[in-house]
């Protein structure tokens, strides 16, 4: 199968590229390298089934690109990923995450693409939900332009499915972590803690550490993307999480243990807009896609710490 991965040089995108190549698929990777890193694709570049195109989905000739490469399935991970930037500059966020998605959908329609697997956000589209674990049947309640853009992307792609028969599915990951995650961004607390503790730097927890998140390992998320690229789940959003809540304080303790560093974070006032809880119901992904998480948190943390330890040497 011939595939296109947008955001291919990112943390999740590059891991997906490696998985698709390992499964024997041809992959065209598209990324403008504004946040993704070329080094994430070093392994992929050794494959004769991989081609890389440096381009921005907002202004690239997507119609020409898709006509040339003729992918059967598009995995759409290219995005503006900073919630803070979306709040500071909503038009920019919408340009990338909404207009970019619509441009891709239109090019896919014209090229006869079978399916687009779109990246939504299990951690933000529900806002503060009325129940935990949170299922896809809960109303969306975006609390940021970033979340609103993800919902808009879903709506547009579902419209393309209904009007033009361009199939789509939406992967809504919980808090993804693992090797290649950016330790310098606003999110990615596992990477942030891992790198800081390995370097002997002080770590910060915002709030009292009781906030919880649903942490899911990147390989498990990639498996959900691959499964969603098949015929099942058209037009549906799939929560991809473990269904297990872990507090920030518990997470820090686990990472400090894996590193062999003191478990002594600094505590700072909570940040405006941070959610108190997050826990996703993954029943739909289990039942429709046959997906289930395979990597427990302790194992995933060990793999992540090993990655950053090797990188620092």
From Swiss-Prot:
Record keyword Isomerase present: yes
Enzyme Commission code: 5.1.3.2
Keywords: Carbohydrate metabolism, Galactose metabolism, Isomerase, NAD
UniProt: NAD(+) binding residues: 11-12, 31-36, 56-57, 77-81, 146, 150
Cited InterPro entries: NAD(P)-bd_dom, NAD(P)-bd_dom_sf
Function: Involved in the metabolism of galactose. Catalyzes the conversion of UDP-galactose (UDP-Gal) to UDP-glucose (UDP-Glc) through a mechanism involving the transient reduction of NAD.
Record protein name field: UDP-glucose 4-epimerase
One Pfam assignment: GDP_Man_Dehyd
One record GO biological process: galactose metabolic process
Keyword Isomerase: yes
Gene Ontology terms, MF aspect: UDP-glucose 4-epimerase activity
Reaction(s) catalysed by this chain's protein: UDP-alpha-D-glucose = UDP-alpha-D-galactose
Enzyme class: isomerase
Organism for this UniProt entry: Mycolicibacterium smegmatis (strain ATCC 700084 / mc(2)155) (Mycobacterium smegmatis)
């Amino acid at each position: 199968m011939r595939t296109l991965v947008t955001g291919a040089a990112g943390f999740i995108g590059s891991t997906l590229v490696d998985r698709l190549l390992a499964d024997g698929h041809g992959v065209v990777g598209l990324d403008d390298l504004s946040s993704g890193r070329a080094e994430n694709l070093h392994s992929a570049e050794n494959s004769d089934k991989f081609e890389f195109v440096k381009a921005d989905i907002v202004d690239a000739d997507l119609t020409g690109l898709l006509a040339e490469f003729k992918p059967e399935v598009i995995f759409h991970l290219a995005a503006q990923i900073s919630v803070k930037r979306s709040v500071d500059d909503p038009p920019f966020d919408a340009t990338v995450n909404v207009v970019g998605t619509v441009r891709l959908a239109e090019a896919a329609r014209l090229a006869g693409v079978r399916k687009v697997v779109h990246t939504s956000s299990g951690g933000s589209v529900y806002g503060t939900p009325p129940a935990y674990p949170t299922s896809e049947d809960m109303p969306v309640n975006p609390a940021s332009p970033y979340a609103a853009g993800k919902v808009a992307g879903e709506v547009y792609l579902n419209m393309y499915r209904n009007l033009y028969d361009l199939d789509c599915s939406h992967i809504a990951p919980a808090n993804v972590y693992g090797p290649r995650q950016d330790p310098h961004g606003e999110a990615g607390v596992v990477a942030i803690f891992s790198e800081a503790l390995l370097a002997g730097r002080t770590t910060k927890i915002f709030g009292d550490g009781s906030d919880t998140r649903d942490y899911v390992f990147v390989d498990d998320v990639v498996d959900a993307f691959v499964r969603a690229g098949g015929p099942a789940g058209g037009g549906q959003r799939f929560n991809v999480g473990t269904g297990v809540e872990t507090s920030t304080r518990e997470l820090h303790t686990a990472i400090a243990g894996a590193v062999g560093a003191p478990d002594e974070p600094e505590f700072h006032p909570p940040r405006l807009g941070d959610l108190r809880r997050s826990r996703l119901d993954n029943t739909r992904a289990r039942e429709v896609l046959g997906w289930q998480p395979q990597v427990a948190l302790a194992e995933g943390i060990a793999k992540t710490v090993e990655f950053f330890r090797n990188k620092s040497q």
